[in-house]
Amino acid sequence: MIDNTKIRSLLEEGLTVFQLDSIGDLLLDFLLLLNKWNKTYNLTAIRDIETMVSKHLFDSLAILPWIKGNHIIDVGTGPGLPGIPLAIAKPDLQFVLLDSNGKKISFLNEVKRQLNIKNIEPIQIRVENYHPNQGFDTVISRAFSSLEQMIKWTQHLVAQDGLWLAMKGRFPDTELVPIHQTYRVERYAVPGIEGERCCVLINNTNKE
């Protein structure tokens, strides 16, 4: 039995930190839908809904300050993480949610329908086979094992003056060694999560 009151309280407490108090109801609806589908389709390894609040919702929202532009893609989005929380927080931005897993894209289409989220476009395709008409301002992912692999497989997606945003745990010293583009690393804290979190911002320009 899910204690909606407790979940709502956890959400409100964290959203106050992000100054996003107004989106609590929609995030809760997303979380409950994710929890329901997860029992059948194994969309995420996290089963505890309270843990989902911090590790899925808050971790996604924490990268908001570094998103660039209006045209965003979340590569390997899975069940819409971080794409759905970001789209809820920023309804004026457009998000493509890319994944090759049909069950996850079916879930995202249901999220779009039930929650009436108009600024997302779930697409089922492998990243190397996706060729949009224009590049994206920000390419987000937490799905790649290394920064080098992320750039390799998504180079064709980023706009000329665009940005890669990779979500990481510990500071990725060794992953940064082969990166030829200019970059910076931003550390951040997530309510309810202990330990280091950071995101790597990589510009689509080579180091001089």
UniProtKB/Swiss-Prot annotation:
The answer to whether UniProt assigns keyword Transferase to this entry is: yes
Superkingdom of the source species:
Bacteria
What is the recorded function of this protein according to its Swiss-Prot or TrEMBL entry?
Answer: Specifically methylates the N7 position of guanine in position 527 of 16S rRNA.
> Where in the cell?
Cytoplasm
EC main group:
transferase
Q: Which residues bind S-adenosyl-L-methionine?
A: 76, 81, 127-128, 142
For molecular function, the Gene Ontology terms on record are: rRNA (guanine-N7-)-methyltransferase activity
Question: According to its UniProt record, where is this protein mainly located?
Answer: cytoplasm
- What name is this protein filed under? Ribosomal RNA small subunit methyltransferase G
Gene encoding the protein = rsmG
EC numbers, comma separated = 2.1.1.170
User: Could you tell me the keywords of this UniProt record?
Assistant: Cytoplasm, Methyltransferase, rRNA processing, S-adenosyl-L-methionine, Transferase
GO cellular component terms, A-Z: cytosol
Family assignment from sequence similarity: Belongs to the methyltransferase superfamily. RNA methyltransferase RsmG family.
Reactions it catalyzes? guanosine(527) in 16S rRNA + S-adenosyl-L-methionine = N(7)-methylguanosine(527) in 16S rRNA + S-adenosyl-L-homocysteine
Source species taxonomy: Bacteria, Pseudomonadati, Pseudomonadota, Gammaproteobacteria, Legionellales
